[in-house]
C-alpha cells in the first residue's frame, strides 16, 4: 500500500472532481426521470427508452473520448503536449460521424426503434415525441464530451463539473416551466423535457468554447488546430481507440437488448428499471470517478517511465475500489425508500415493489462493479491494453447474459426480479477474469510514439 498522504490527496481530489462531474451529468437525466415520473408514468417510461437508445451514442462517444484520454495521459506524462491537439481532432471526426448516423436513425424510424424495446403503445408514443426534439442535441453533446474528456487527460477536470452544474440548473428550471406549464408557460410534457435538455446541451458547448478561447493555456486549442491535423495521428488514435469503440458499441447494444427484454415484461417493469438504473447512475458516481482517475494516474505513471512504482500503485487502487464498492452498495440499499418517495404518487403499487427489488439487486452487484470495472476500464485500459475489455464483454454479454436472461423471461417465465438479476450478475463473476488479467501485468504498454514496445513486467 502507498503510505504517502499526498498520493491520496491528489487521487481523491481527481476522483471526486470526476465523480462530481458524473453526478451532475447523470442528474440531468435523473431529473427528467423524476420530474416526468411525477407527471406521468408513461411519459417517464417513454423517455427512459429514449435514454437507452441515447446510451448507445453515449457509449460510442465515451469510447472516442477514452482513446484520446489514454494517448493524451501518456503524452502528458512524457511532458510532450504537441501531439494532443491532433489526437483530439481525430476523436472529434469519429465522434461526429457516429452522432450524425444516430440522428439519421432516430429521425427516420423512431417508432420502429422504440418498438424493439417495448410493446406498450402509449409508452412508445411518448418516446417518439421526445426523440423529435432531443435528436438535435446529439452532435452538440458529442463535441462537448470529447473536448472535456481530452482536457481531462492533461489534468483539467474542474471545467467538467462547472459545465455540468450550470446545465443542471438550467435543465431543472426549464423542466419545471415546460413539463408542467408553470408561470404561464405551455404544458408540454415530454416535449418540454426534451427542449430543456437541448437548451442545456447547447449551453454546455458554449461554456467549453469560451474556456478554450479565453482560459485554456496548456494545449492552446484552436479551430484550426482541430481541423488541420497531421493525419498520421489518426492511425495512432485508431490503434488505441478501435478496441474501446468496439467494446462500447457492443456494450451499448447489449444494454438496449436488456432494456428490450425488460420492456416486453410490461409497463411497470419498464418504469421500475428506469428508476433503478437512473438511481444507480447517480449513486455510483464515486466508483466511476475513481475508475477514471485511476486511468489518468496509471497512464501518466507509464508515460513517465515509472513502471517500478506500478505494483504498489495497483494494489492500493484495488483496496480503494473494494471499499468504495461496499460503501456504494450499502448507500443504494439504504436509500431505496427515500428515492422512491421522490417520484410521488404516479407509480403503481407493482412498479413501486419492483423498483425496491431491482435496487436491492443493484446494491449487491455494485460491489463487483466498483472493483472490476475500475480495474478494467481504469487500470488495464489506462495502462495501454484497450482490447481485453472488448473480448471479455463480448463473450460475457452475448454468450451468457443475453441468452440466459431471454430464456428466463420468455421461456421459463421467471419473476421480473430474477430476470433483472440475471441481466446484472456479470458484474460479479467478471471479477475473476479481470483480477487474473490485472495480476498478469500483460496490460502494461507504452502507446506513445517512439516507445511502442510492451513494457517489461513491473
Predicted segments, located by residue:
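N-terminal transmembrane alpha-helices
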Residues: 2-34, 38-39, 52-67, 71, ...
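Short runs within selected transmembrane alpha-helices of multi-pass transporters and secretion channels
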Residues: 65, 134-153, 160-168, 193-208, ...
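Small-residue hotspots at the loop-to-helix junctions and early N-terminal turns
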Residues: 41-52, 127, 131, 267-282, ...
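Transmembrane helical elements of multi-pass membrane transporters/channels
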Residues: 13-32, 133, 167, 200-204, ...
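Short alpha-helical transmembrane segments in multi-pass integral membrane proteins
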Residues: 1-18, 72-139, 185-241, 298-365, ...
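Helix-terminus/linker motif at the lipid-water interface of multi-pass membrane proteins
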Residues: 23, 27-45, 114-121, 177-188, ...
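Small-residue-rich hydrophobic transmembrane alpha-helices
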Residues: 44-104, 141-160, 259, 272-336, ...
Amino acid at each position: 500500500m502507498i503510505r504517502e498522504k499526498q498520493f491520496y490527496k491528489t487521487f481523491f481530489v481527481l476522483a471526486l472532481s470526476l465523480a462530481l462531474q458524473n453526478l451532475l451529468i447523470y442528474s440531468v437525466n435523473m431529473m427528467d426521470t423524476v420530474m416526468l415520473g411525477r407527471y406521468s408514468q408513461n411519459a417517464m417510461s417513454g423517455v427512459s427508452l429514449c435514454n437507452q437508445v441515447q446510451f448507445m451514442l453515449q457509449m460510442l462517444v465515451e469510447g472516442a473520448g477514452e482513446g484520446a484520454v489514454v494517448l493524451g495521459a501518456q503524452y502528458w506524462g512524457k511532458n510532450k503536449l504537441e501531439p494532443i491537439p491532433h489526437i483530439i481532432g481525430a476523436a472529434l471526426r469519429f465522434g461526429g460521424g457516429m452522432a450524425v448516423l444516430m440522428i439519421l436513425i432516430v429521425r427516420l424510424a423512431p417508432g420502429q426503434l422504440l418498438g424493439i424495446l417495448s410493446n406498450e403503445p402509449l409508452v412508445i408514443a411518448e418516446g417518439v415525441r421526445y426523440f423529435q426534439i432531443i435528436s438535435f442535441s446529439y452532435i452538440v453533446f458529442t463535441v462537448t464530451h470529447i473536448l472535456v474528456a481530452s482536457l481531462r487527460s492533461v489534468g483539467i477536470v474542474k471545467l467538467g463539473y462547472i459545465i455540468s452544474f450550470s446545465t443542471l440548473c438550467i435543465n431543472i428550471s426549464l423542466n419545471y416551466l415546460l413539463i408542467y406549464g408553470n408561470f404561464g408557460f405551455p404544458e408540454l410534457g415530454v416535449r418540454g423535457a426534451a427542449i430543456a435538455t437541448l437548451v442545456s446541451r447547447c449551453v454546455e458547448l458554449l461554456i467549453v468554447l469560451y474556456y478554450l478561447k479565453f482560459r485554456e493555456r496548456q494545449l492552446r486549442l484552436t479551430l484550426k488546430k482541430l481541423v488541420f491535423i497531421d493525419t498520421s495521428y489518426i492511425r495512432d488514435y485508431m490503434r488505441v481507440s478501435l478496441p474501446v469503440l468496439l467494446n462500447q458499441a457492443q456494450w451499448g447494444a447489449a444494454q438496449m437488448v436488456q432494456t428490450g427484454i425488460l420492456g416486453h415484461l410490461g409497463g411497470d417493469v419498464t418504469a421500475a428499471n428506469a428508476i433503478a438504473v437512473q438511481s444507480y447512475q447517480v449513486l455510483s458516481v464515486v466508483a466511476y470517478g475513481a475508475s477514471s482517475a485511476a486511468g489518468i494516474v496509471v497512464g501518466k505513471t507509464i508515460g513517465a517511465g515509472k513502471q517500478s512504482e506500478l505494483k504498489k500503485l495497483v494494489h492500493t487502487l484495488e483496496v480503494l475500489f473494494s471499499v468504495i464498492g461496499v460503501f456504494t452498495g450499502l448507500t443504494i440499499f439504504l436509500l431505496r425508500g427515500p428515492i422512491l418517495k421522490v417520484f410521488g404518487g404516479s407509480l403503481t403499487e407493482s412498479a413501486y415493489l419492483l423498483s425496491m427489488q431491482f435496487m436491492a439487486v443493484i446494491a449487491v452487484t455494485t460491489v463487483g462493479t466498483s472493483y472490476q470495472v475500475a480495474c478494467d476500464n481504469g487500470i488495464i485500459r489506462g495502462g495501454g491494453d484497450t482490447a481485453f475489455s472488448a473480448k471479455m464483454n463480448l463473450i460475457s454479454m452475448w454468450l451468457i447474459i443475453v441468452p440466459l436472461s431471454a430464456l428466463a423471461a420468455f421461456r421459463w417465465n421467471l419473476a421480473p426480479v430474477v430476470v433483472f438479476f440475471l441481466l446484472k450478475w456479470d458484474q460479479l463473476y467478471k471479477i475473476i477474469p479481470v483480477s487474473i488479467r490485472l495480476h498478469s501485468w500483460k496490460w502494461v504498454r507504452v502507446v506513445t510514439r517512439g516507445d511502442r514496445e510492451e513494457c517489461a513486467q513491473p
